Amino acid sequence: MATMQCDVVSVKESIYSGQVTMLIAKGAGGELGILPGHAPLVTLLQPGPIRVQLENGTEEIVYVSGGVLEVQPHVVTVLADTAIRADNLDEAAILEARKNAEQLLANQKSDLDSAAALASLSEISGQLETIRKIKNRAL
């Protein structure tokens, strides 16, 4: 099966680097499936899971808070603001953060409070979607 080089990096660290058979991500225009030989592309990423299918058939899932996806025919690069391996996400902490963001939104005192709460809720939704993907994979 054909492969391509995939690099997933955040501001802090390299999360994944290796050969993959496919990458699935949520871009500005919706979900993208990238295969080896894909046409060149650059798009903004939405908060949510990046699914990387490895040569051995297993799948790595990484949460990204946003960033840029660059595709070349045999190389795909994810430059993420924040990237966390899905296995390292803490569901209880994320649910608590969602509760706090919803309270901030309900008690907004300014447009800045509202914007911060909405941005936080967007990231939290992406994290919860990533956790759901992990749980579905285990079934």
Curated annotation (Swiss-Prot):
It is a peripheral membrane protein. It comes from the Bacteria. SUPFAM superfamilies: Epsilon subunit of F1F0-ATP synthase C-terminal domain, Epsilon subunit of F1F0-ATP synthase N-terminal domain. Gene3D superfamilies: ATP synthase delta/epsilon subunit, C-terminal domain, F0F1 ATP synthase delta/epsilon subunit, N-terminal. The keyword Iron-sulfur does not apply. One of its GO terms (molecular function) is proton-transporting ATP synthase activity, rotational mechanism. It holds the Pfam family ATP-synt_DE_N. It is found in: Cell inner membrane. Keywords: ATP synthesis, Cell inner membrane, Cell membrane, CF(1), Hydrogen ion transport, Ion transport, Membrane, Transport. InterPro entries: ATP_F1_dsu/esu_C_sf (IPR036794), ATP_synth_F1_dsu/esu (IPR001469), ATP_synth_F1_dsu/esu_N (IPR020546), ATPsynth_dsu/esu_N (IPR036771). One of its GO terms (cellular component) is plasma membrane. The keyword Transmembrane does not apply. F-type ATPases have 2 components, CF(1) - the catalytic core - and CF(0) - the membrane proton channel. CF(1) has five subunits: alpha(3), beta(3), gamma(1), delta(1), epsilon(1). CF(0) has three main subunits: a, b and c. NCBIfam families: ATP_synt_epsi, PRK00571.1-4. Produces ATP from ADP in the presence of a proton gradient across the membrane. Belongs to the ATPase epsilon chain family. This is ATP synthase epsilon chain. It comes from Acinetobacter baylyi (strain ATCC 33305 / BD413 / ADP1).
